[in-house]
Amino acid sequence: MRYIMQHISKLPHYYSVVPKEIINFATFLNQNRKNMKAFVFPGQGAQFVGMGKDLYENSALAKELFEKANDILGYRITDIMFEGTDEDLRQTKVTQPAVFLHSVISALCMGDDFRPEMTAGHSLGEFSALVAAGALSFEDGLKLVYARAMAMQKACEAQPSTMAAIIA
């Protein structure tokens, strides 16, 4: 923990807890909970054909954000997300923006009555968490995710690789 705290970028707001005992940590969480909501966002691998289509068809806000994303990306990612092939959706350069968009737009469409007090994300999901928390704009988050996806796509094309997951 000391190493992490010394080497992370200094953000304007962050909080960490190092419990002396697990029971103390559980007590802390129980005493400070007060109906708090937390959103946890997935990383790459959570994609599926049809993701976000219901939101697009039933929410004016979602439709506006998806169309804004199409403009920012310079192509209609919604066509791939809603009706594309699984193979097209699995390309890193498509997958990462698609998962980000589905996660963020789902969270933003929940309305002000259901805003989280805490957000977290796994890998790619960290960007979704930052946008859902209001620390990063939708537009900037999408641009960062797309740049990341393109860099990772290029690296994968230069050096073919795979990812393995261990489920215990």
Which ranges hold each PLM region?
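Helix-rich "cap/lid" substructures immediately adjacent to catalytic or cofactor-binding pockets
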Residues: 37-120
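Alpha/beta catalytic cores of group-transfer enzymes, especially the acyltransferase/condensing modules
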Residues: 44-46, 73, 133-168
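A general structural motif at alpha-helix termini
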Residues: 84-85, 123, 145-148
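Gly/Ala-rich beta-loop-alpha elbow adjacent to hydrolase catalytic centers
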Residues: 103, 121, 125, 137
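Hydrolases whose catalytic domains are alpha/beta-hydrolase-1, hotdog thioesterase
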Residues: 128-132
